[in-house]
């Protein structure tokens, strides 16, 4: 989000602001779909195209397309989550904690990845 400032260096790509010349409301706030692009354990039991809740002005443009787990449309198509299981990395641009039953299922799946035995 800060030009000239390096991120953590875990993922290759660019963080970009939504274009201001497209008439989009920025920040992007509200419900939108997540189009699942690859099998991912945090999306087990989640229907492709499920709606999730966003509040953001920036998005990741991942360099490695195989990292992209979901894409979403908001004036442009953007990477809305990434998954790199080999390094236990799962990241969403949307807010699972604000995404109703779908979000709760995503959080449950994530907890199970860590071996949480209290999850039903």
Q: What label would you give each PLM region?
A:
Residues 1-29, 108:
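Cysteine-nucleophile active-site neighborhood
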Residues 6, 65, 102-105:
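Generic recognition of short, well-ordered alpha-helical segments
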Residues 11, 70-71, 92:
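Hydrophobic residues at beta-strand termini and immediately following loops
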Residues 13-16, 22, 75-84:
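Mobile beta-alpha loop/short-helix "lid" or hinge segments that flank ligand
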Residues 26, 31, 58, 62, ...:
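Phosphate-binding/catalytic loops
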Residues 31-83:
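Catalytic beta-strand/loop cores that center a nucleophilic Ser/Cys/Thr
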Residues 85-86, 92-120:
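Acyltransferase
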């Amino acid at each position: 989000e800060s030009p000239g400032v390096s991120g953590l260096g875990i993922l290759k790509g660019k963080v970009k602001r939504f274009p201001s010349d497209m008439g989009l409301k920025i920040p992007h706030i509200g419900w939108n779909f997540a189009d699942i692009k690859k099998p991912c354990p945090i999306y087990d039991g989640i229907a492709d195209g499920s709606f999730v809740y966003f509040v953001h002005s920036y998005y990741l443009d991942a360099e490695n397309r195989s990292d992209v787990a979901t894409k979403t449309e908001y004036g442009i198509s953007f990477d809305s989550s990434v998954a790199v299981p080999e390094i236990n990395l799962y990241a969403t641009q949307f807010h699972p904690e604000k995404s109703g039953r779908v979000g709760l299922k995503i959080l449950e799946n994530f907890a199970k990845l860590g071996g949480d035995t209290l999850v039903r």
